[in-house]
Every structure is written in C-alpha cells, then in structure tokens.
C-alpha cells in the first residue's frame, strides 16, 4: 500500500533515483495505491546530469510493493521494495530500460511497454 509521503525507488533509467508520493491518482478521496496505480511524485534524489532534477514533479506507475497483492486464483505475491517507473505525459515510460521484476497486474492495467521492457514478470 502506497500512501501520500511514501518513498519509492525508481526502476528505470529516467534519471531519478528516489521519489516521494504527492498524490495517488484516481478519485478525490483515494487513500492508497497498489501495483498498476498512477501516482504523482516529487523527485527526491537524481543522478548527476540527468533529465530529471531534484524537486521535479512527475507521474509514475507503481511496479513493485512490499505489501502482498492477492490474485484472483488465491495466491499472493510481494516484493522486497516499493518501486515505480516514471511516465511521460502520454503514460509511456520516460526511460528506455526497466530494472528488476514487475508484477503481471501491469499487463491488465494497460502498461504493455513496461511489461515488454522488464527482465522478469511475476
């Protein structure tokens, strides 16, 4: 569960390294987000000479959470960290690579480009 003020690792090569959630998108009273949800974030740490700088406001999609996700078949999956992929204004990934595994729930939410770039889909 990702709420406001949560920190997310960045799982792509967009130039950001750490994000802080400002708002979970999808409704005015939305309390938390999970895998596949879009969040508005502030860049808290960035690589030198990258496209994104500290303080930039970006949209990102959550790709991994430490809180387990229940699937329709009754199984659960969880990851070792909370991570997101930075998006551009067309909801496409800003980077050209995705690091680490992603959940297959992204495919159902329509983020096919991220699924195809990921090395593993669980």
Swiss-Prot record:
<dbReference type="InterPro" id="IPR000218">
    <property type="entry name" value="Ribosomal_uL14"/>
</dbReference>
<dbReference type="InterPro" id="IPR019972">
    <property type="entry name" value="Ribosomal_uL14_CS"/>
</dbReference>
<dbReference type="InterPro" id="IPR036853">
    <property type="entry name" value="Ribosomal_uL14_sf"/>
</dbReference>
<dbReference type="GO" id="GO:0006412">
    <property type="term" value="P:translation"/>
</dbReference>
<comment type="function">
    <text>Binds to 23S rRNA. Forms part of two intersubunit bridges in the 70S ribosome.</text>
</comment>
<keyword id="KW-0689">Ribosomal protein</keyword>
<keyword id="KW-0699">rRNA-binding</keyword>
<keyword id="KW-0687">Ribonucleoprotein</keyword>
<dbReference type="GO" id="GO:0070180">
    <property type="term" value="F:large ribosomal subunit rRNA binding"/>
</dbReference>
<comment type="subunit">
    <text>Part of the 50S ribosomal subunit. Forms a cluster with proteins L3 and L19. In the 70S ribosome, L14 and L19 interact and together make contacts with the 16S rRNA in bridges B5 and B8.</text>
</comment>
<keyword id="KW-0694">RNA-binding</keyword>
<dbReference type="Pfam" id="PF00238">
    <property type="entry name" value="Ribosomal_L14"/>
</dbReference>
<comment type="similarity">
    <text>Belongs to the universal ribosomal protein uL14 family.</text>
</comment>
<dbReference type="InterPro" id="IPR005745">
    <property type="entry name" value="Ribosomal_uL14_bac-type"/>
</dbReference>
<dbReference type="GO" id="GO:0022625">
    <property type="term" value="C:cytosolic large ribosomal subunit"/>
</dbReference>
<dbReference type="GO" id="GO:0003735">
    <property type="term" value="F:structural constituent of ribosome"/>
</dbReference>
<protein>
    <recommendedName>
        <fullName>Large ribosomal subunit protein uL14</fullName>
    </recommendedName>
</protein>
């Amino acid at each position: 569960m990702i709420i406001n003020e949560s920190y997310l690792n960045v799982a792509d090569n967009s130039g950001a390294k750490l994000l802080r959630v400002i708002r979970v998108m999808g409704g005015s009273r939305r309390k938390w987000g999970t895998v596949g949800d879009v969040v508005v974030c502030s860049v808290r740490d960035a690589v030198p000479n990258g496209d994104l700088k500290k303080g930039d406001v970006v949209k990102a999609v959550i790709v991994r959470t430490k809180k387990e996700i229940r699937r329709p078949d009754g199984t659960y999956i969880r990851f070792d960290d909370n991570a997101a992929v930075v998006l551009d204004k067309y909801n496409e990934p800003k980077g050209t690579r995705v690091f680490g595994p992603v959940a297959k729930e992204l495919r159902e939410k329509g983020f096919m480009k991220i699924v195809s770039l990921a090395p593993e889909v669980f």
